[in-house]
């Protein structure tokens, strides 16, 4: 069982829960952590890994270890699932900077555990977040990510807990579109842009 804390009692922590591989953009997370901690040194930036921290590009592992030695980030390795859930339940933001994802498990897990989520407004994420601009940042914009992060570290999103409901409906909308009964859900025309 995972015990959730009230949002105001949670650590000022930003979690990276994705694989530490190049397509997940770990460099953006590390750059963000360095820049944000200059202004807010009390904020913890934590990497969570189910095994030893590894990557398809060893540079990212080396750089993460260097930043951990500098006190910029924390590396949590060899976590069991409940250990990870306990970290999420005591954190304020799950941060993602992936170039691609569909419905990320990390999104649903964090949202269910009362942890805000912040993802790039890219590929499938706008649909996952129902175009909630408060939980998405302009891709590759450190400035936008930092300003959204500051807000999400201070208070829970009013949309907290709605991601799973929206995702369930996404499958129904996709089937409606494929069977010709979902024109109102299409997002490929000028009315959507």
Sequence positions of predicted segments:
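Short hydrophobic beta-strand element within catalytic cores of glycosyltransferases
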Residues: 116-119
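Short alpha-helical donor nucleotide-sugar binding micro-motif in glycosyltransferases
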Residues: 86-91
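Short alpha-helical segment that forms part of, or immediately flanks, the ligand-binding pocket
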Residues: 85, 107-112, 126-127
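Aromatic "clamp/platform" in nucleotide-sugar-dependent glycosyltransferases that forms part
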Residues: 98-100
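Nucleotide-activated donor-binding/catalytic signature segment of Leloir-type glycosyltransferases, i.e.
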Residues: 58-79
């Amino acid at each position: 069982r995972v015990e959730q804390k009230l949002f105001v009692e949670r650590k000022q922590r930003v979690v990276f829960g994705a694989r530490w591989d190049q397509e997940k953009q770990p460099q953006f997370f590390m750059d963000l952590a360095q820049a944000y901690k200059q202004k807010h040194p009390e904020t913890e930036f934590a990497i969570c890994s189910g095994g030893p921290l590894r990557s398809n590009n060893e540079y990212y592992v080396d750089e993460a270890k260097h930043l951990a030695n500098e006190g910029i980030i924390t590396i949590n390795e060899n976590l069991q699932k409940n250990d990870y859930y306990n970290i999420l339940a005591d954190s304020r933001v799950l941060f993602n900077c992936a170039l691609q994802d569909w419905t990320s498990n990390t999104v649903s897990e964090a949202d269910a555990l009362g942890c805000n989520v912040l993802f790039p407004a890219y590929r499938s994420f706008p649909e996952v977040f129902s175009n909630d601009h408060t939980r998405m940042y302009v891709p590759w914009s450190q400035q936008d990510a930092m300003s959204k992060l500051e807000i999400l570290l201070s208070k829970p999103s009013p949309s907290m807990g709605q991601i799973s409901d929206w995702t369930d409906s996404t499958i129904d909308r996709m089937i409606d579109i494929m069977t010709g009964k979902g024109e109102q859900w299409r997002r490929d025309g000028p009315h959507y842009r």
